[in-house]
């Protein structure tokens, strides 16, 4: 019978490739016949999809990116628990002995989105897929981070500020809510936060230079920001 740790590793690899699916790029081409990488920030995520392709493509991108992250966790949790030593699903819960295995799967899905092998290891910035995996992992933390994101964006009008706040808040929230969780889980949550912040490095530079674009549901762009 397959060892649950080996199965967790297999699930992580599969999650990486599921997380890597570039829905923003696909939807932009299907609905607008547009490559959203060639305008705005060049990113394949929800915000650039909104700026380049409009609200419909952006909403679908947000939904599908969240879903792909959630699906990775929701499928892996019972699958891993059902094999090997036959331990219960509860052992995969945050703070339980096997929680680190889901942490690895969460991290793999986010890394797949940011380092998509389908796009020569370029991709999005990990916010929507990150929300999906965290909601599926432990929804109260996911909703709290979503609330933090919404408040930060509402105050500043910068999506990147909300994204950075949520990314920094994730490992803090994970450690605060589950102080006795495994070191592996804490490491994975910290790595998700660090990687998302790293993916926003250009946004940080633009914020510091006063050149970051504010959120707009009506303004469209057809040229790259740096042109």
Each PLM stretch: what is its role?
Residues 1-10, 74-104, 135-141, 176-188:
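Helix-coil boundary and interhelical linker segments in multi-pass alpha-helical membrane proteins
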Residues 2, 18, 23-73, 114-127, ...:
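Interhelical loop and helix-boundary elements at the membrane-water interface
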Residues 9-13, 62-66, 107, 111, ...:
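Residue-level signature of the transmembrane alpha-helical core
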Residues 15-18, 77, 108-113, 149-153, ...:
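Alpha-helical transmembrane segments of multi-pass membrane proteins
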Residues 50-55, 76-80, 108, 125-156, ...:
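Interfacial segments of multi-pass membrane proteins
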Residues 52-54, 58-61, 94-112:
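Helix-loop-helix "hairpin" substructures at the membrane interface of multi-pass membrane proteins
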Residues 122, 146-150, 183-189, 206-213:
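A cytosolic-side transmembrane-helix exit/cap motif
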Residues 143, 159-166, 180-192:
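Loop-to-transmembrane alpha-helix initiation sites
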């Amino acid at each position: 019978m397959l060892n649950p740790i080996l199965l967790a590793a297999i699930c992580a690899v599969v999650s990486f490739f599921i997380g890597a699916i570039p829905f923003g790029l696909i939807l932009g081409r299907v609905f607008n016949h547009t490559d959203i990488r060639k305008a705005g920030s060049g990113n394949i995520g929800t915000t650039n999809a909104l700026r380049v392709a409009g609200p419909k493509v952006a909403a679908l991108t947000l939904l599908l990116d969240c879903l792909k992250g959630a699906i990775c966790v929701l499928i892996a949790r019972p699958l891993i628990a059902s094999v090997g030593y036959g331990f219960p699903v509860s052992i995969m819960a945050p703070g339980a002995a096997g929680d680190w295995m889901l942490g690895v799967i969460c991290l793999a899905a986010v890394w797949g989105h940011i380092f998509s092998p389908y796009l020569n290891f370029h991709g999005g910035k990990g916010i929507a897929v990150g929300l999906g995996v965290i909601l599926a992992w432990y929804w109260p933390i996911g909703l709290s981070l979503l609330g933090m994101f919404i408040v930060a964006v509402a105050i500043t009008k910068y999506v990147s500020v909300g994204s950075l706040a949520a990314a920094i808040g994730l490992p803090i929230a994970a450690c605060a809510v589950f102080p006795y969780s495994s070191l592996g889980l804490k490491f994975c949550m910290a790595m998700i936060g660090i990687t998302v912040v790293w993916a926003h490095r250009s946004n940080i530079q633009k914020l510091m230079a006063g050149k970051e674009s504010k959120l707009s549901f009506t303004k469209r762009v057809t040229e790259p920001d740096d042109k």
